[in-house]
Amino acid sequence: MKTFEELGVSPEIRRAIEEMGYACPMPVQEEVIPYLLGENNDVVALAQTGTGKTAAFGLPLIQQINVNNRIPQSLILCPTRELCLQIAGDLNDYSKYIDGLRVLPVYGGSSIESQIRALKRGVHIIVATPGRLLDLMERKTVSLSTIQNVVMDEADEMLNMGFTDSINAILADVPQERNTLLFSATMSPEIARISKKIPAQCKGNHHRTQK
């Protein structure tokens, strides 16, 4: 088993995750992190909640952010407000020792005006539910033209909740020259159809191993 250092994780991030109790990489992290730290790499993974997938995509996304350029560089789509807040909280914890990195959770049921103000101040990573992000796009208060990485977390749940059209509209607004990361607990026909569009270099099946 490799260490986070051997996977290429930066000292600042390693310091933060060690304080969080991360001793060694989980299997999905060991597979995914090196790919995402490379260039032009897509990922499709069957990974249930509790496999460590948030760190698998979160650590390399954070490491690749140019904090001096306060524009959206990574987009994470997820099905619920609760997961949106959880992922954003984890990313803030991982980036504890990276000065100036800004993560914005975007979800329905909260003030859209405050989210618009935060976008105007500048953010690096957007964690969003599809419906609210599409609302912001229609208001022309968010630009996805600088996004380099798109993560679809719990993609099967998003499709089950009827977000297919919203996701398609969002992806159509993101540059084609991007990395796409799809994480799903199941391989439904719709997920299989989407995954075929992703020329993934890293595909894996990871079951629940920790909470």
Regions found by a protein language model. Name each.
Residues M1-L46:
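Conserved pre-motif I regulatory segment
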Residues S10, T54, G58, C84, ...:
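A general structural signal for well-ordered alpha-helical segments in protein cores
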Residues P11-E19, R70-E138, T146-N149, A192-K196, ...:
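Conserved nucleic-acid-binding Ia/Ib motif block in the N-terminal RecA-like helicase ATPase lobe
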Residues I33-N41, T54-N69, L85-S95, L134, ...:
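Walker A/P-loop NTP-binding motif
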Residues L37-G38, K120, P199:
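Hydrophobic/aromatic position at a conserved helix-loop-beta junction
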Residues A47-T51:
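The conserved Walker
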